[in-house]
């Protein structure tokens, strides 16, 4: 009996049937919004009325907008500070990677920030920084110093928000490093110890190379976290004081939602998307080269 079409092509068609729902979902909820945002960025539009074609006008305005310049500088500051998370997490991970009951209990406490919502983190640190009843000013009073309205100071507010953001970021990187430390090659470490490797030499030449995958992922997620920073800015300062803490993601939302400038907000979203795309492409190329043994 001659096989029907399905029997003859089952191995080829089965993957198509399984992938089609995911492809449709991706097209509707990812690709369509991306191209819609790109199209809207060429218009001046309040989200309700007629759309006025302005071409690259929004991008030219962005180039000359001081608030966008401030947002970019703040994103760079976030990036620099977030790159402190991997080394701090590594140092903390080495300290916590001990077979002591007290350390095991402390380890669970360090995981806590990772599971806390960013909204909760923002509220906790807002209360902590409060100049009237916050713990920060209680410590300053014990030291004989004047109260400090950290989030109201345009020179210090960024650092206050970044410190709050680093709390869960360090916890996430810590999990990566503890996983990497648990998977270290014990035989290699023992061989190096027999050969006389100790202290810094042991760490730099034996332990750190084995933690390379964890370090790579920690750096990648830290950079992405810095570029996508929005929630804590929105919760703690709303971009203030006087726009000094705004970042690209927050500026995008403020222009599109609060100022009713959908086109300008879409232009900001497009630029942020391109920056993230370039970085993600670099990341994927690095992963591919690493798998091929070219790194």
What are these regions (language model features)?
Residues 5-295:
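A structural signal for multi-pass alpha-helical bundles of membrane permease subunits
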